[in-house]
């Protein structure tokens, strides 16, 4: 698995290079059927990732945000597959705030067992497997093992979306303020929010709105290998490819030994 993880980090870097070529120039935006944005960078990164994964593991199927949908009657029989978001945070990419990522995860029996999250504009790589643990590398500095943290006395730190906020999130923050004290809010784009929890910079990332499975899988692998977890609002672990829809339930990305964050919902 360690060798496989190394190969996937190289693929993520290559996809990041394709994205940055577009990022440095004029960005043209199309709209998908659900009105979400699509750029040439999404498609270029998708091509790099899919072609390289097929070379690396020709017998392992791939689900990608930018590929044709695969009926559940087919994928329900998959024990092992790749789950990819070639460019997570397209809105951040369009805004040019650098907070977008390449997400690649290997799913086995409904769980992400290997994950790579690469933010090419930031030179920031997160990678994880059971054998290696969770690793962060900034630029060319030495990789370091990261660990999520338990909630401790003092100001709670909550990671939140830079592009997606709603009344549920506002109500959650109010409950946290009343029970634990006013939280510090860290706003960030893409799956980097989950990685903040994985490296112990935040206590929780509540996602109280829609996401797709490719948005979370790679970062969930990083978080779980760092000692944290992602649970839905019933406290159950987030699982993959269990139904026709590829939408996630609302969830909490949590640190070590977390409180029942769902009790902070009104």
At which residue positions do the language-model features occur?
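Conserved beta-strand termini and adjacent loop/short-helix elements that scaffold enzyme active sites
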Residues: 32, 65, 188, 207, ...
């Amino acid at each position: 698995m360690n060798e496989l993880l190394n190969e996937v980090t190289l693929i993520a870097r290559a996809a990041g290079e394709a994205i940055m070529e577009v990022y440095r120039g004029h960005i043209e935006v199309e709209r998908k059927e659900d009105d979400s944005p699509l750029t040439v960078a999404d498609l270029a990164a998708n091509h790099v990732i899919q072609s390289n994964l097929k070379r690396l593991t020709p017998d392992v199927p791939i689900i990608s945000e930018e590929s044709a949908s695969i009926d559940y009657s087919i994928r329900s029989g998959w024990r092992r597959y790749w789950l990819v978001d070639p460019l997570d945070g397209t809105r951040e990419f369009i805004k040019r705030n650098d907070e977008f990522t390449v997400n690649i995860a290997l799913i086995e029996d409904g769980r992400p067992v290997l994950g790579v999250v690469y933010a090419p504009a930031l030179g920031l790589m997160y990678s994880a497997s059971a054998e290696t643990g969770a690793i962060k590398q900034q630029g060319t500095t030495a990789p370091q093992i990261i660990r999520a943290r338990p909630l401790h006395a003092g100001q709670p730190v909550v990671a939140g979306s830079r592009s997606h906020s709603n009344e549920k999130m506002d109500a959650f923050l109010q409950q946290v303020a009343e029970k634990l004290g006013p939280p510090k809010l860290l706003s960030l784009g893409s799956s980097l929010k989950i990685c903040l929890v994985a490296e112990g910079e935040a206590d929780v990332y509540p996602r109280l709105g829609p996401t797709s499975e490719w948005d979370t899988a790679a970062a969930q692998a990083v978080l779980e290998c760092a000692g944290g977890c992602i649970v839905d609002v019933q406290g159950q672990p987030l699982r993959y490819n269990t139904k026709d829809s590829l939408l996630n339930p609302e969830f909490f990305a949590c640190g070590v030994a977390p409180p029942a964050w769902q009790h902070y919902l009104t």
